[in-house]
């Protein structure tokens, strides 16, 4: 099968990483993989793996740029004999939709998160099939954009178990610190103030606790606000803001507990399955896609999104009861192996491609039969 994925850019990020990994997997399995984007740091990794990349300004919203990109994409689709087009963002999806109409090549979309009820957002539901990363996204696509469930396919994000793997902390030859951490962009929805307020309570019970916050800040003032809050809570000596890091598996493996205290609806919660793969116990809020991953008191602990006291108590439970923490971590690891293994997600995606192509074949057969009858 010849597959073309289209997305705005190939810089670092979860969507970009998933695109590259899927393209490499398709290539390895004997399929043709083509990626169209405006370029970025990950292009070299693609081309080194034998994946064809075309640079187009598919991140620009200008109507003239969109028209140019539609024409160029049609030429690429024909040149590469593409069987299915897979769009992963709104402007690329708009371009892919018109190219699909002109070339009669099926087009599918992946909804990685929530979209505002903007007119442009409707395009994410125009795919012949619509892939969603969690049940809550699927529900939103139905309720907000009228996408029928019969066209929605649930494929959660996967995790590379060769990269995120069990690493016994004692075997790393380092002093074992008690570390509670968060990983994710420094944005209000992630619940960083809630986390810091909870950790101030934890620190009163465990004064030597260490806190690590890993992630970049799209808006610098917000990071400064969090640093000020940490100082006001008396956590300056305990907390580290580590920024963007590329050694996440190693850092995550050193955590005693991962906190995922989102205060808004998370589309999925990739860091939770990464923690599960590493055998790290998890405390998360009962929000959005997080409940698709964690079964309370089986795979981890779920808490309300508005109470630092309850969050602190949950973290302390896992720190003070290592047997319980390990039981939850082992259960989550098994779930990740069973439901979120990256190759399994890729195979499910390939099945969606095959379904989209087969629907086109059925339509062609029906039209041919109709023409014959006249």
Q: What is each model feature region?
A:
Residues 13-21, 182-204, 221-224, 309-310, ...:
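A conserved mid-protein helix/loop that constitutes part of the nucleotide-sugar donor-binding site
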Residues 35, 281-284, 294:
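Short hydrophobic beta-strand element within catalytic cores of glycosyltransferases
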Residues 35-41, 183, 210-224:
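Glycosyltransferase donor-sugar binding loop
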Residues 61-65, 139-144, 150-151, 158-175, ...:
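Acidic anion/phosphate-binding donor-loop and adjacent secondary structure
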Residues 101-135, 139, 146-147:
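A conserved, positively charged/aromatic
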Residues 219-225, 236-245, 251, 301-302:
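Active-site donor-binding acidic/aromatic loop of nucleotide-activated sugar
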Residues 238, 253-267, 280:
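Acidic donor-binding loop of glycosyltransferase active sites
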Residues 296-297, 301-308, 317-323:
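Conserved acidic donor-binding segment of nucleotide-sugar-dependent glycosyltransferases
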């Amino acid at each position: 099968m010849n597959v073309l994925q289209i997305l705005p850019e190939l810089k670092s990020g979860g969507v970009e990483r998933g695109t590259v990994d899927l393209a490499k997997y398709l290539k390895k399995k004997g399929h043709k993989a083509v990626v169209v984007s405006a370029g970025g740091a990950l292009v070299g990794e693609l081309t080194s793996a034998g994946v064809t990349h075309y640079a187009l300004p598919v991140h620009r919203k200008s109507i003239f740029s969109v028209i140019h990109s539609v024409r160029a994409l049609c030429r690429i689709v024909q040149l590469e004999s593409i069987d299915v087009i897979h769009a992963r963002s709104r402007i690329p999806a708009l371009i892919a939709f018109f190219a699909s109409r002109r070339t009669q090549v099926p087009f599918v979309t992946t909804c990685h998160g929530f979209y505002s009820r903007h007119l442009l957002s409707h395009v994410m539901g125009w795919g012949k099939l619509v892939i969603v990363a969690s049940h809550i996204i699927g529900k939103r696509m139905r309720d907000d954009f009228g996408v029928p469930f019969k066209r929605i396919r649930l494929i959660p994000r996967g995790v590379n178990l060769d990269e995120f793997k069990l690493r016994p902390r004692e075997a790393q030859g380092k002093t074992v610190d008690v570390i509670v951490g968060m990983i994710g962009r420094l944005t209000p929805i992630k619940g960083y103030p809630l986390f810091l307020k909870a950790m101030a309570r934890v620190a009163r019970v465990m004064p030597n606790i260490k806190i690590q916050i890993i992630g970049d800040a799209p808006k610098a003032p917000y990071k400064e606000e969090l640093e000020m809050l940490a100082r006001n809570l008396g956590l300056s000596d305990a907390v580290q803001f580590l920024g963007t890091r590329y050694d996440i598996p190693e850092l995550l493996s050193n955590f005693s507990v991962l906190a995922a205290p989102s205060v808004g609806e998370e589309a999925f919660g990739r860091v939770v399955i990464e923690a599960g793969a590493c055998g790290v116990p998890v405390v998360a809020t009962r929000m959005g896609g997080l409940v698709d991953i964690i079964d309370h008191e089986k795979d981890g602990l779920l808490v309300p999104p508005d109470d630092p006291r309850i969050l602190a108590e949950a973290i302390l439970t896992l720190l003070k009861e290592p047997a319980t923490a390990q039981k939850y971590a082992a259960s989550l690891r098994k779930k990740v192996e069973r439901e979120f293994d990256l190759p399994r997600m890729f195979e499910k995606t390939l099945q969606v491609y095959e379904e989209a192509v087969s629907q086109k074949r059925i339509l062609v057969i029906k039209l041919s039969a109709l023409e014959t009858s006249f």
